[in-house]
């Protein structure tokens, strides 16, 4: 930065005025790092992050001979409904009524064939090639038509679980979650006399033991998940602050964070059509279940099908209700097709709540559907960026970023972060353009699964936002010498630096930040500032960091106001839902 001062004092007239303007628009020094005037607003675009959001269902019928794999997935986020009815003697596949006959065709209890498993693998490969993701459910209901009593004898369910596990284990990069169907109509664990809590728990635990921890496994209700985790008297013991819960949580360890639930009765009644109990002494009621999801489902997918309200029940299927409870349950995915009447109503209803940048006074025709669609799962916004001004002889680059997660939920799988250095200069007498572009991987300690969304707590009669989703991300990386990247001399030339966050898979699908993406298309990342390389500088170590003062100035704090909570951040203040006051 000294170079700007030298040039400033050597210039006169118009050139001096131009440089003063440039200097005023340039970043400001603070504690050895430079605060960049980057775009810090949510552009309110619907982002192409397909590991969350609205899914499209697609059925895959597996046969002993294999069947036809999914060649063209219908969406980037697919609900892959793989059904294995031909491997169950209890599943009737059709009725031949020709000539007055009524001959029923049944499946057959048998091992899953290699051909069938290959078709499942080919379908997952197609999803990967499409740069998509899938929520996977496997069941015995033919073509997902809602037939009852289709589940085979329990020993066959267990055999099929063990045979499916290797395929599922190989594809955790595209499987968002496994909805543990395997029982009942639609794979929803109802309408089947073969269903018991013990059988569902045994099958689910077998799947847990035979698949890696990256695969999140969901059951249909909180009661089933409680049984899987080892609770027997869940009406009494399934309270996250209770002694029995603490005992089981300690014994289960990380499995507590791997088991979740899917909800295909979502918001249809205050009980979600039986998902939550009405008698809290014998079942898990809504508040106990939500508190469990809030704590242990922090990185576990949650969603399903939102329904219209049943007659004479409380109406909770509104965007306004989701703008509160969605953050507690970390809701991350929903069916775009069901219930279509409810979704159509969301598209026609204006969203009249202010939630940070989602402000109906800023945006005309902000619908409830757009609010929900944009907030399912995670949504990262770069709010502040401080970076090293000069990379010296040691090649060290440092950054301090404030990234807010404004989505309902969090990342549910590991990703890789990296820095991208990009720049151009004119070289030679013909002003030929030279460019530089290279990527520097960041350590696994920079974990975006920990860039958490807001935290809302119930404290007596108060609803308090105790954390507003602003996360501090500290980066230290060795960018190395540019001599190893390009033959040109880049000393003193400002180079752009981007933060890039991508899935660790062959297609390198990257996360889109909610900031304006016009500039960020260069790198598939988010612009965090510029840096100058100068090897005459012996060290890039920042000058005396005044960390305490910076934190005091920038960190939000919670203040009570008339039985509510507001989060104050500098001169801004927000209501509990993030609306500006």
Annotate each PLM feature:
Residues 13-26:
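Bacterial N-terminal signal peptides
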Residues 31-120, 145, 288-362:
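N-terminal substrate-binding region of glycoside hydrolase catalytic domains
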Residues 112-133, 150-177, 198-210:
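An active-site-proximal structural segment forming one wall of the substrate-binding cleft
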Residues 135-145, 164-197:
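Active-site groove signature of glycoside hydrolases
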Residues 177-345:
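Catalytic-core regions of glycoside hydrolase
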Residues 373-538:
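Extracellular/luminal regions of secreted and cell-surface proteins that mediate adhesion/ECM remodeling
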Residues 538-581:
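C-terminal outer-membrane/trafficking sorting elements
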């Amino acid at each position: 930065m000294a170079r700007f001062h030298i040039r400033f004092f050597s210039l006169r007239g118009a050139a001096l005025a131009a440089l003063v303007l440039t200097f005023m628009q340039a970043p400001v020094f603070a504690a050895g790092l430079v605060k960049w005037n980057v775009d810090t607003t949510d552009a309110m675009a619907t982002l192409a992050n397909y590991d969350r959001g609205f899914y499209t269902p697609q059925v895959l019928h597996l046969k002993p001979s294999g069947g036809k794999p999914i060649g063209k997935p219908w969406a980037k986020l697919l609900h892959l409904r793989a059904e294995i009815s031909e491997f169950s003697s209890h599943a009737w596949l059709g009725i031949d009524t020709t000539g007055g006959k009524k001959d029923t065709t049944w499946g057959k209890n048998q091992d899953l064939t290699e051909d069938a498993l290959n078709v499942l693998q080919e379908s997952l490969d197609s999803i990967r090639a499409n740069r998509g993701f899938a929520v996977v459910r496997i069941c015995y209901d033919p073509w997902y038509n809602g037939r009852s009593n289709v589940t085979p004898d329990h020993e066959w369910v267990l055999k099929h679980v063990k045979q499916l596990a290797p395929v599922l284990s190989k594809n955790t990069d595209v499987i968002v979650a496994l909805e543990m169907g395997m029982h009942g109509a639609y794979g929803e664990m109802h309408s089947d006399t073969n269903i018991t809590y013990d059988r569902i728990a045994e099958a689910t635990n077998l799947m847990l033991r035979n698949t890696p921890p990256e695969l999140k496994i969901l059951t249909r209700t909180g009661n089933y998940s409680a049984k899987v985790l080892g609770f027997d008297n869940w009406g009494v013991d399934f309270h996250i602050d209770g002694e029995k819960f603490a005992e089981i949580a300690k014994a289960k360890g990380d499995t507590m964070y791997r088991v979740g639930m899917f909800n295909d009765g979502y918001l249809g009644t205050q009980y979600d059509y039986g998902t939550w109990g009405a008698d809290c002494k014998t079942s898990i009621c809504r508040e106990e279940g939500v508190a469990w999801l809030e704590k242990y489902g922090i990185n576990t997918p949650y969603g399903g099908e939102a329904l219209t309200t049943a007659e004479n029940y409380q109406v909770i299927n509104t965007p306004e209700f989701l703008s509160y409870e969605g953050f507690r349950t970390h809701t991350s995915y929903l069916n775009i097709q069901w219930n279509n009447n409810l979704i159509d109503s969301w598209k026609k209803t204006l969203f009249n709540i202010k939630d940070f940048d989602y402000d109906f006074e800023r945006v005309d025709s902000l619908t409830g559907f757009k609010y929900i669609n944009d907030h399912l799962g995670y949504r990262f916004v770069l709010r502040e960026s401080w970076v090293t001004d000069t990379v010296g002889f040691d090649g060290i680059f440092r950054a301090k970023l404030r990234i807010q997660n404004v989505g309902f939920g969090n990342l549910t799988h590991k990703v890789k972060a990296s820095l991208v250095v990009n720049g151009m200069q004119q070289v030679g007498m013909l002003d030929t353009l030279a460019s530089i572009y290279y990527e520097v991987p960041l350590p696994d300690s920079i974990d975006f699964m920990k860039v958490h969304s807001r935290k809302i707590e119930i404290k007596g009669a108060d609803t308090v936002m105790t954390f507003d989703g602003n996360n501090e991300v500290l980066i230290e990386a060795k960018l190395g010498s540019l001599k190893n990247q390009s033959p040109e001399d880049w000393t003193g030339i400002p180079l752009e630096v981007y933060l890039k966050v991508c899935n660790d898979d062959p297609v390198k699908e990257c996360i889109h930040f909610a900031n304006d993406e016009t500039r960020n298309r260069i790198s598939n990342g988010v612009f965090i500032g510029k840096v100058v390389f100068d090897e005459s500088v012996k060290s890039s170590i920042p000058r005396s960091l005044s960390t305490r003062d910076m934190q005091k100035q920038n960190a939000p704090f919670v203040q009570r106001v008339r039985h509510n909570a507001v989060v104050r951040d500098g001169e801004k203040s927000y209501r509990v839902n993030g609306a500006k006051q």
